[in-house]
Amino acid sequence: MITSITQSTAHGVRRVCEVLQVPRSSYYHAAEPTQRSVEDDDLTQSIYTIFRAHRGRYGYRRIWKQLAAQDIICAPARVRRLMLEHGLVALQPKTFAPKTSDGRADAPSPNLLLNQPLPAKPNEVWAGDITYIPVGERWLYLAVVIDLCSRRIVGWSLADHLRSELVVAAMDQALQARHITPNLIFHSDRGSQYGSTVFRQLLKGHSIRQSMSARANPYHNAWTESFMGTLKAEMLQNGRFINASDASAEIFAFIDGYYNTQRLHSSLNYTTPSNFESAIALAN
């Protein structure tokens, strides 16, 4: 019917569909498929495959990059259009809401990153932070260490307390995983855990220089805040882990099995942290 109306009047498909309150996508789906619509169907299947493989974590830009890596060449706007038409909406982290630590670090270290460019190589600057993880009817606490060059999570620790041992465990894991040189910078907020004697002794023992954000200014440590937001949006979706074992297993799978090795990072020109580090190693 729509075709006959457009053929007998000066109105286009858009206007006729608006008057009849029929979605244009329904009309095009019912109409005899064109070469373009056939190509759209094939592209949509590829988009679906990537979207499902990444559990709804990828928006159109990352999917477009993933398609290109598979030699499927198209415009990003086309991917966006097809995703909108099929209701594929990526998980979104909550808007960054500044949160302060207890700010109780004794003799806080200066901010060595202020007005400095991001590092050009791995193991030049690490950053750390702590966040709350909902588990059953209680909270656990996750401490991470991230390499600011590659955005790779190089160490993490999960515990039911906020003592300094939490951040020490995360740093110990990072030190075991990486080969560092003297003068590596470790940056954090002014939390008492990072200002504790035991943590500072650990840094000193490995010739690591400590850097801290200005008090009540978490924007100075936005890299770790960004990761925490991504983790909660893409794993929890406002839910809770069943228990501590479930939380530990899922966080391990997310960090070591996905975030570091499979997830494309926009800040790395849409490559993964592991591939980014490999490219730097080859270049040097």
Regions found by a protein language model. Give the residues of each.
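Charged DNA-binding/catalytic regions of mobile-element recombinases
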Residues: 1-284
